[in-house]
Amino acid sequence: MALLQIAEPGQSAAPHQHRLAVGIDLGTTNSLVAAVRSGVTATLPDENGQHSLPSIVRYTQDGIEVGQVAALSSAQDPKNTIVSVKRFMGRSLTDIQSGEQAFPYQFEASENGLPLFVTPQGQVNPVQVSAEILRPLVERAEKTLGGELQGVVITVPAYFDDAQRQGTKDAASLLGVKVLRLLNEPTAAAIAYGLDSKQEGVIAIYDLGGGTFDISILRLNRGVFEVLATGGDSALGGDDFDHLLQAHMQQVWQLTNLDPQLSRQLLIEARRVKEALTDASDVEASLTLADGTVLKQVVTKAEFDNLISALVKKTIASCRRTLRDAGVTADEVLETVMVGGSTRVPLVREQVEAFFGKAPLTSIDPDRVVAIGAAIQADILVGNKPESELLLLDVIPLSLGIETMGGLVEKVVSRNTTIPVARAQEFTTFKDGQTAMAFHVVQGERELVDDCRSLARFTLKGIPPLAAGAAHIRVTFQVDADGLLSVTAMEKSTGVQSSIQVKPSFGLSDTEIATMLKDSMKHAKEDISRRMLAEQQVEAARVLESLNAALAKDGDLLTSDERQQIDAVMAQLAEIARGDDADAIKQAIEVLDEHTQDFAAKRMDNSIRVAFKGQSIDNI
């Protein structure tokens, strides 16, 4: 029996209008949409009862197919069926083509070097393909919820850089959908479990999806979600398990020179076998060739475990490094949350349990937990839970800084700093009369610019022509909740400023972040030595330039012998500064300082005489 809601005319029966917002897990393999309805958070099914939408888009002469329809045709038309498009987001065509994996697609490069898929519908980029995946999810949500969405929260891997995050936002913008927040996938899982289980303490989020692996160490305390550290691999996931099994099956069947269609069929069968091995000790695989021949083989769990063992060990090694970054041990981790369909693989669960010493949490479907967390966050951000005390603190994966003289990096925002964040630091001019300053924004953990990743360059003009070191330029780094960076430089006395929003033309390569972190640890001692040398060389150059200016102005205060002695010591410093002995340079600077103290005193006396010339003692 239907219940009637009674209210005064013109008034709502509810205390406030419920705003429609959803969380979307835009995954590499599958995507989902979830919402909070009547206090219950759940993923939304399509008209066929399917919750997950395969992240597959097929372009034909007649139109565009998305999801399961596209998946069914992928084996017959691999060239025009784009799968795992998330792996192409924010990457250059050169980066993609230089990778180990071959793709069946026809590519062309855009003006800025980004990949374009050549399809029967024309050229499309990864952002447009992603928008096609988002479209049915948004339509499903609006149909189910009965109205237009006022915002969405979309999840991204923690390792996505600025370009990849911006590309995700742009995909939603193509549909006219407002993005309330981009949310790291592991953090979304923490929200789902944090609100359900009221956990307090250190939690590990082990997220192994189709294309990426993320490990996040979080501290949950009284509604505050703080990410202590993140790690992982942006090019390791269940897809790699599939490709290894595909290669194994191909070798057993002694198949060579596969055409794209047969290769796709074999990959689909490998994925089916992988999923079946979750609950079975062995599975029969089969493949039908073009001539009707049916090939069969039995794949055992032991064989599959042996194939993927090295990759699973890589994820455990990432866990170990990230725990070290967070400053905690495995024993301090209260719970481990499993996220992503690939965590259903028995070997993965076994290895994770062995490393952390406890069975991982799987009470929420690992395929749906990210979407559920995103939906909870969307419900809060859209204003449906004004009483909520949930506070979310993400972190940036790599330090951000500015290039200084000598090719050194001055870190402004350190790695694993919680975001959103704003940090400011003051810099000054190097030369007398300097009226402009070039800024080079870099990303990385190394001490020298050459070993870090360049993000952007911009110039501040209109600096007052003062003596070296007299101007004060305040540089502010702001990282918003989506991980996008804005840098502003302002000269304090005039207020003149310049700024830039960092949107790199393409993202990091698959393993670059992990490599950068490993290199920073491997070369730490060497980098410190190189930094100390560069700092002394910069100081030597500054001292010599300053002294040359002083000699040009007041050199007549010196006797011929005094001038020759200073010139000789200066030449000695210049020669030593070209070497690689930081201590020797420092010592040479000190020697020059000793030899110029009398000159400095004479300059001071002369300045005082000039200042007081013609004045009586009564006027002083």
UniProtKB/Swiss-Prot annotation:
InterPro entries reported in the protein's UniProt record: ATPase_NBD, Heat_shock_70_CS, HSP70_C_sf, HSP70_peptide-bd_sf, Hsp_70_fam, ISC_FeS_clus_asmbl_HscA
One Pfam entry for this protein is: HSP70
- The entry's keywords: ATP-binding, Chaperone, Nucleotide-binding
Which GO BP terms, alphabetically?
iron-sulfur cluster assembly
Q: List where this protein forms a coiled coil.
A: none
UniProt cross-references to SUPFAM superfamilies, sorted A to Z: Actin-like ATPase domain, Heat shock protein 70kD (HSP70), C-terminal subdomain, Heat shock protein 70kD (HSP70), peptide-binding domain
Quote one Gene Ontology molecular function term: ATP hydrolysis activity
**Key word ATP-binding present:** yes
Q: Which family does it belong to?
A: Belongs to the heat shock protein 70 family.
List the PANTHER family hit by this protein, alphabetically: HEAT SHOCK PROTEIN 70KDA (PTHR19375)
Q: Which HAMAP family does the annotation name?
A: HscA
What does this chain do? Chaperone involved in the maturation of iron-sulfur cluster-containing proteins. Has a low intrinsic ATPase activity which is markedly stimulated by HscB.
What is the protein's name according to its record? Chaperone protein HscA homolog
What is the source species?
Shewanella sp. (strain MR-4)
Q: Which gene encodes it?
A: hscA
